[in-house]
Amino acid sequence: MILNWRKVIVSFLVIILTNFYNISFTHAESYKWEQIPLNTDEILLDIGFVPDQPQRGWLLGTRSTLFETTDKGKTWELRSLNLEDDKYRLNSISFSGKEGWVTGKPAILLHTTDGGSSWSRIPLSNQLPGDPALITALGTGKAELATDIGAIYRTENSGQTWKAQIQEPLGVIRTVARSENGSYVAVSAKGNFYSTWKEGDDKWISHPRQSSRRIQSMGFTNNNRLWMLTRGGQLWFSSNDSFDEPNWEGPKTPEGKVGFGLGLLNLAFKTPTEIWVSGGSGILLSSQDTGNTWKKETSTDNIPSNFYKISFIDKEVGFVLGNQGTLLRYVSL
């Protein structure tokens, strides 16, 4: 009798695991991603390309790390900014034409008008609330700056003067993102709640988190709706683009439904329907149907790195940024 029960249990487990791996962890083609060697062990934080020079791009990281590529990311050369020391955590880069901006902490702002051949440092006021966290180039001489406590400023004269966009900052935040239409979403330091702001508002609007799980990061879809990654590997999408009263679709679980999660950290859309999610311990997942089914990328299993950021510069080329100088390049074959 005991033996029969053991057979039933074993058969049941086999069925569950087989269905789980077939549905949630179907392996993606491993040849799509390649690791690019870099002469650094620093954490890589952001990447940006020059629209007027599409082969040219820049890669940022901790300890003032700056790399340049002229072949669309196949190879990279370390560049020096000639700063007084290497203490800066360069965390955001953005270009419009050949004009570009780089921010970092402690507070630093760099500006270029020639695609990065030369960089000039723009002084920031000691009264700036917080340190720069996100920079967005908006056109000739125009940019928008968000700090790590939710202050937002805009310049229209190449950084000579800045105008505050909100009356008061939000408080310490863990992540901040900007949509194509100029709206922002920020996650509180502990992930307990998130806040939104759109142009014309005089303050942030705070919202409770959607589930009992703390928020890891948030951002915007291609149609300016919200996405949310929570602890334990859940992914949420808003069903509308209303910031005042966002509605949320049921959670998706890219890593499966067995009850574990390695920690999902960032998300990027390659196309309107193809999504890639990166996370800790070399986890990389993709969906071809806007998150309904997922595949696990196996070529990154043995890379000892957390994948902090994933970014696609077009439909053919994308990058994953991690710690210990880890850089992956996506090539559409």
Curated annotation (Swiss-Prot):
It comes from the Eukaryota. PANTHER family: PHOTOSYSTEM II STABILITY/ASSEMBLY FACTOR HCF136, CHLOROPLASTIC (PTHR47199), PHOTOSYSTEM II STABILITY_ASSEMBLY FACTOR HCF136, CHLOROPLASTIC (PTHR47199:SF2). It is found in: Plastid, Cyanelle thylakoid lumen. The keyword Transcription does not apply. A 7-bladed beta-propeller torus, about 55 by 55 Angstroms, with a depth of about 25 Angstroms and a central pore. Residues 1-28 form the signal peptide. InterPro entries: PSII_CF48-like_dom, WD40/YVTN_repeat-like_dom_sf, Ycf48/Hcf136. GO terms for cellular component: cyanelle thylakoid lumen; photosystem II. Belongs to the Ycf48 family. This is Photosystem II assembly protein Ycf48. Essential for photosystem II (PSII) biogenesis; required for assembly of an early intermediate in PSII assembly that includes D2 (psbD) and cytochrome b559. One of its GO terms (biological process) is photosynthesis. Keywords: Cyanelle, Photosynthesis, Photosystem II, Plastid, Signal, Thylakoid.
